[in-house]
């Protein structure tokens, strides 16, 4: 290969690397500037559900037989079972009622309840093969990705649905009827949606909030 040909080859290679570097920088900047839709920022923080597994449970016996069970009836009237996979807690009461808390997904609830059912069956307790739960509350966080003026919201929204006392609490409380949830709005644009019964309730609430804010001209 001649010196000239080699030089041209090296130049072509250098240009190729330069173009790749420019392309990488362009893609990186585009990624950083890409805005996530508020509806896509939803994150389930906690799901609380209840279930009825039997008519009676001997709590002292459960506490002594199940490894890791916590029971102090002077502090709390139930046995606390903390699971690692899924990472949830089961509050078990003598009436046979169970409260599951700490779940991050509906699947975690089902898995956790089944694990509890298996533990109780191993102790000879008659537990139905199919256990069902009822969701009591879903707490979800979201991000509008833009600061919001809580004072203007307090004036513009339906006053019957608003609670805003910045000296006592930094967020604005907004009660929705459909879906029936409570939304905590913060000046940073962060939201906490609580009271949901279905996973989609949070998304519906965010869509409603966005619509209300746009109608007031507070966001574009």
Regions from the language model: what does each represent?
Residues 1-2, 34:
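Accessible peptide chain termini
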Residues 13-16, 202:
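Intrinsic-disorder-associated interaction segments
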